[in-house]
Amino acid sequence: MSDVAERVKKIVVDHLGVEESKVTENASFIDDLGADSLDTVELVMAFEEEFGCEIPDDAAEKILTVKDAIDFIKANAAA
């Protein structure tokens, strides 16, 4: 697993308080991990801070799973 994936999963575990074993790449933030809309906004902000990238609102709306976040960050992050 890549460093980006590990960092994304750690942020998800820390922000949502879920078990690390539940944070798989195909896990939906809302359906599988119990996030609400505020949680997803906070996750996006945490990803921006951790990886030094900006995630525009239209892109953030498409980040529904852990893999979506990893793929976006790999394509756009400075770190």
UniProtKB/Swiss-Prot annotation:
MF-aspect GO terms? acyl binding; acyl carrier activity
Compartment(s): Cytoplasm
- List the pathway annotation: Lipid metabolism; fatty acid biosynthesis
User: Per UniProt, what is one Pfam family of this protein?
Assistant: PP-binding
Q: Which PROSITE patterns does the UniProt entry name for this protein?
A: CARRIER, PHOSPHOPANTETHEINE
Keywords of this entry: Cytoplasm, Fatty acid biosynthesis, Fatty acid metabolism, Lipid biosynthesis, Lipid metabolism, Phosphopantetheine, Phosphoprotein
Q: Where O-(pantetheine 4'-phosphoryl)serine occurs, residue numbers?
A: S37
One Gene Ontology BP term is: lipid A biosynthetic process
Do you know which InterPro entries this protein is assigned to?
A: ACP, ACP-like_sf, PP-bd_ACP, Ppantetheine_attach_site
Task: Give a short account of its post-translational modification.
Answer: 4'-phosphopantetheine is transferred from CoA to a specific serine of apo-ACP by AcpS. This modification is essential for activity because fatty acids are bound in thioester linkage to the sulfhydryl of the prosthetic group.
Q: What is its main location?
A: cytoplasm
Question: Can you list the GO cellular component terms from the UniProt entry?
Answer: cytosol; membrane
SUPFAM superfamilies named among the record's database cross-references: ACP-like (SSF47336)
Q: Where is the Carrier domain?
A: 2-77
* UniProt xrefs under PANTHER family: ACYL CARRIER PROTEIN (PTHR20863), CARRIER DOMAIN-CONTAINING PROTEIN (PTHR20863:SF76)
Q: What does this protein do?
A: Carrier of the growing fatty acid chain in fatty acid biosynthesis.
**Similarity comment:** Belongs to the acyl carrier protein (ACP) family.
Name by which UniProt lists this protein? Acyl carrier protein
Name the source organism: Azospirillum brasilense
Taxonomic path: Bacteria, Pseudomonadati, Pseudomonadota, Alphaproteobacteria, Rhodospirillales
